[in-house]
């Protein structure tokens, strides 16, 4: 089973796959780089102004606290903290933040739904993230009347070393890979970019092997290319691997 996440985010998937008796192939198609931009510095400088801070990834939390270690102590006690899911909540908690909102649906849409019970009109909202993310969340917040600062906290791009991803493509085309997991639309798009002139052939192969997507947004990107994928009810790596294992006739405890 191939894992296309960045290496530093792959340990859980590898452990689950190997624990189920499979062999994990780490072939990152995405690289995350911290970006200590002026907009992120502004999030730190204005820490005591925020009514709501939203984190949609572990990388955003880690980048902000790398730049501004005292952030948790600088925000107001009545400032709410919202995160995309339980893993981001755990990382935020490790940095001293009290997490107030975790949506049931671990997507931007889920976060917006979780905020609908609040009147956030006029609120100052900090949203540190990658600028390559979808615009659904900031636009939705603005439609609710919030003043949103989207701060670039990290950059998502092709890995500097595409060798492992190229080996994955070779393995898929040679029939040596049984399944591939994707955890974001970018992991899908970047694999196709790395494939280059083998893109069409790769897409046809992915239509035949087992593919897992962590959630509906990633699934949608795959479906744009006619690729079907297993998607878990809860959008976590553990649930994705479990759903894939069941689909392949395995069992993950």
Swiss-Prot record:
Q: State the pathway, as annotated in the record.
A: Porphyrin-containing compound metabolism; protoporphyrin-IX biosynthesis; coproporphyrinogen-III from 5-aminolevulinate: step 3/4
The source's superkingdom equals Archaea
Extract the signal peptide range: none
State if RNA-binding is listed as a keyword. no
Q: Which terms does the UniProt entry file under GO BP?
A: protoporphyrinogen IX biosynthetic process; uroporphyrinogen III biosynthetic process
A molecular function (GO) held by this record is: uroporphyrinogen-III synthase activity
Q: What class of enzyme is it?
A: lyase
Q: Look up the EC number in the record and give it.
A: 4.2.1.75
Catalyzed reaction equations: hydroxymethylbilane = uroporphyrinogen III + H2O
Q: Which UniProt keywords apply?
A: Lyase, Porphyrin biosynthesis
* Task of the protein: Catalyzes cyclization of the linear tetrapyrrole, hydroxymethylbilane, to the macrocyclic uroporphyrinogen III.
Which PANTHER family does the record associate with it? Answer: BLR5956 PROTEIN
Q: So what family is this one in?
A: Belongs to the uroporphyrinogen-III synthase family.
The protein's name is Putative uroporphyrinogen-III synthase
């Amino acid at each position: 089973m191939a894992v296309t996440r960045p290496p530093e985010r792959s340990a859980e998937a590898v452990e689950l796959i190997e624990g189920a008796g499979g062999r994990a192939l780490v072939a990152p198609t995405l690289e995350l780089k911290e970006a200590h931009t002026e907009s992120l510095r502004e999030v730190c400088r204005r820490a005591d102004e925020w009514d709501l801070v939203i984190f949609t990834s572990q990388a955003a939390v880690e980048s902000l606290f790398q730049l501004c270690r005292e952030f948790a102590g600088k925000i107001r006690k009545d400032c709410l903290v919202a995160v995309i899911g339980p893993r981001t909540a755990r990382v935020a908690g490790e940095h001293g933040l009290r997490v107030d909102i975790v949506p049931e649906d671990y997507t931007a849409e889920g976060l917006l739904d979780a905020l609908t019970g609040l009147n956030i009109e006029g609120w100052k909202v900090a949203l540190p993230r990658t600028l390559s993310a979808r615009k659904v969340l900031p636009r939705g917040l603005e439609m609710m009347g919030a003043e949103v600062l989207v701060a670039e906290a990290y950059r998502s791009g092709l890995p500097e070393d595409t060798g492992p991803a190229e080996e994955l493509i070779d393995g898929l085309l040679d029939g040596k890979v049984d399944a591939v997991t994707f955890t974001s639309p970018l992991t899908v798009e970047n694999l196709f970019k790395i494939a280059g002139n083998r893109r069409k052939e790769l897409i046809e192969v992915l239509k035949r092997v087992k593919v897992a997507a962590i959630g509906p947004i990633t699934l949608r990107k795959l479906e744009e290319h006619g690729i079907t994928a297993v998607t878990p009810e809860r959008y976590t790596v553990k649930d994705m691997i479990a759903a894939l294992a069941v689909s392949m006739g395995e069992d993950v405890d």
